[in-house]
Swiss-Prot record:
Major location (coarse): membrane
Gene: yknV
Positions with a binding annotation for ATP: G396, H397, T398, G399, S400, G401, K402, T403
Membrane-topology annotation of the record: Multi-pass membrane protein
Subcellular location(s) of the protein: Cell membrane
Alphabetically ordered keywords of this record: ATP-binding, Cell membrane, Membrane, Nucleotide-binding, Transmembrane, Transmembrane helix, Transport
Record's protein name: Uncharacterized ABC transporter ATP-binding protein YknV
């Protein structure tokens, strides 16, 4: 098999621990999956079961009518009246069976669609509530695979697999009872083939299950690569890495193809082996059945009925193999789905959390420590306070802990040590909704959703009027370029706002944040993507709009934080300097050096 060529950033497409799930098949997990059928136990489910019972009963009756009554009584006894009656009865039963099958398929499809809808809704809702650490450890592609592909793979299991399993088990039980009733000796003779069937099933079961697990893993890897390749197409083309990317994709695609081929090859082995076992059973039936007829132990009609039932015996067994494969595929997917559903948020809200309708915005950090992993601390006993309505700027090299502080204020992560307070209340005591609803964040990498510009600005406050949206846009200088667009605020923008410039996207994010009317605004290098002319426009707007609000500014351009009430310089997670712009310049420390370096670069 061709292996995916790994190089550069593509090496990140590995099988992380959350992708490798090796749990044995167990009924507890199946019952958990079937719990999603529970809401329909009084509606669609009983109707489906009724059609199963009717269809199974009809199938079991027809061979007896044909063999014992048509052959042994009507034809052998030359009773034409009985023959005509039996023909009408059998024809009516076939029509009834057809109607039962149509209704069963219809209702089971409805049930399957309901269950898939509920399961996908449950999974998506759960993922929405997980903490940022969960998303740090997984690619967007692998998450999409769980929500889309893995749940889709359960659709056939719910629409046909489970009901077919029930149908086949009922049919098998009925056939075995009737076979022993017709001829215990002949039944026992035929049953000698069952050990062969058992051996085939047990030997293939584990191999087939592992094959479908591999298929799911390869699909996840393929989807992850596709997702990132599409999102990063501009970077790929800018660095002329198309050939390398295509070569890597060819390897990943080949691995996916090989995994499917191996799984289907093992699946394909099952049915022919069942048919071979069926042939052996048929040979036993003909040989021993003929002997019993000649000895007048059974009649020809019983023999014919027996032949019908033998076919009905092996047919569900053959299908059980197929249903079992569906179960294996479903288990492989459900394990991955439940692995997500069992994931608990790292950031949890207390049962009696305080819900503050309005906060003033005073923020304090008291000996706060934090680390993203065990290897390196991101913050070392950081302490500071921000009076309500004032502006704090965070400065430092990449990895100094600036964004970490912003994330902790919004409680996207919980501090490993120390206490963070807002208005004197530990943020762990506040409800997440009341905390985050009063904080607006503007990031350097602005995310624009598919929809209109109006809808994007209104995202954080859905009930805002059009006038309020326009007022917020005017305040940050976004109204000027929006009004120049053909459709204005009704202009449709694609995912991530690709038709807009970086500066325009940033202005929309400013308007979005300000429309929410927060007590606290966090600007995470929010002006880094804005040109100098646009920056001048928004600086004046920010002075007005930040008045009366607490602001935390993470600065890349130090010129944007001159007017900050206080500046903290961070280095490797430690607070090194603190003061306003003039004080830090006079100190001649790290901040003064950064300002001098940026000024020199600007002159050059």
């Amino acid at each position: 098999m061709k292996q995916a060529k790994k190089q550069g950033v593509l090496e990140r497409f590995y099988y992380s621990s959350d992708e490798i799930i090796e749990k044995p098949f167990n009924w507890a997990q199946m019952w958990r999956l079937l719990s999603y059928v529970k809401p329909y136990r009084k509606t669609i489910l009983p109707l489906s079961f009724l059609t199963v019972l009717i269809g199974t009963a009809v199938k079991l009756v027809i061979p007896i009518l044909i063999g014992v009554y048509v052959l042994d009584q009507a034809i052998t006894g030359r009773n034409s009246e009985l023959l005509i009656q039996l023909i009408f009865i059998i024809s009516g039963l076939y029509v009834l069976n057809y109607a039962a099958n149509v209704l069963r398929i219809r209702w089971m499809n409805q049930l399957g669609q309901h269950v898939i809808y509920d399961l996908r809704q449950h999974l998506f809702t759960h993922v929405q509530r997980l903490s940022h650490r969960f998303f740090d450890q997984r690619s967007a592609g692998s998450i999409l695979v769980r929500i889309m592909n893995d749940i889709n793979s359960l659709q056939e299991l719910f629409t046909s697999g489970v009901i077919n399993l029930l149908t086949d088990l009922l049919l098998l039980a009925g056939v075995i009872i009737i076979l022993f009733t017709l001829s215990p000796e002949l039944t026992i003779a035929i049953m000698v083939t069952l050990p062969i069937m058992f051996f085939i099933s047990t030997s293939l079961r584990k191999k087939i299950r592992r094959s479908w697990q591999t298929v799911r893993l390869k699909q996840s890897k393929l989807n992850s690569h596709l997702n990132e390749s599409i999102q990063g197409i501009r970077v790929t083309q800018a660095f002329t890495q198309e050939e390398e990317n295509m070569a890597y994709f060819d390897g990943v695609n080949q691995e996916n193809y090989e995994s499917w081929r191996e799984a289907t090859r093992k699946n394909a082995m099952f049915r022919p082996l069942v048919e071979m076992t069926n042939a052996i059973g048929t040979a036993v039936l003909i040989w021993y059945g003929a002997t019993l007829i000649m000895n007048e132990t059974i009649t020809i009609g019983v023999f014919v009925s027996f032949a019908f039932y033998l076919g009905m015996f092996w047919e569900p067994i053959s299908r059980l193999g197929q249903v079992y494969n569906q179960l294996l595929m479903g288990m492989a997917s459900s394990e991955r789905i439940f692995e997500f559903l069992d994931e608990q948020p790292n950031v949890k809200e207390k049962p009696n959390a305080i819900h503050n309708e309005k906060i003033n915005g005073e923020i304090s950090f008291e000996e706060v420590e934090f680390s993203y992993d065990e290897k390196r601390k991101a913050l070392h006993a950081v302490s500071f306070s921000i009076p309500a309505g004032s502006t704090l700027a965070l400065v430092g090299h990449t990895g100094s802990g600036k964004t970490t502080i912003a994330n902790l204020i919004s409680r996207f992560y919980d501090a490993a040590g120390g206490t963070i307070k807002i208005d004197g209340i530990p943020i762990k005591d506040l409800s997440l909704a009341s905390l985050r609803s009063q904080i607006s964040i503007v990031l350097q990498d602005t995310f624009i959703f598919s929809g209109t510009i109006m809808e994007n600005i209104r995202f954080g406050r859905p009930n805002a009027s059009d006038e309020e949206v326009m007022k917020a846009s005017q305040a940050v200088g976004a109204d000027e370029f929006i009004s120049d667009l053909a459709e204005g605020y009704a202009t449709e923008v694609e995912e991530r706002g690709s038709v807009l410039s970086a500066g325009q996207r940033q202005l929309i994010s400013f308007a979005r944040a300000l429309l929410a009317d927060p007590a606290i605004i966090i600007l995470d290098e929010a002006t880094a993507s804005i040109d100098t002319e646009t920056e001048v426009k928004i600086q004046q707007a920010l002075k007005t709009l930040l008045k009366g609000r607490t602001a935390v500014m993470i600065a890349h351009r130090l010129s944007t934080i001159r007017d900050a009430d206080r500046i903290i310089v961070l280095d490797h997670g430690r607070k090194i300097e603190e003061g306003n712009h003039d004080q830090l310049l006079a100190k001649g420390g790290i901040y003064a050096g950064l300002v001098k370096a940026q000024y020199s670069t600007a002159i050059e």
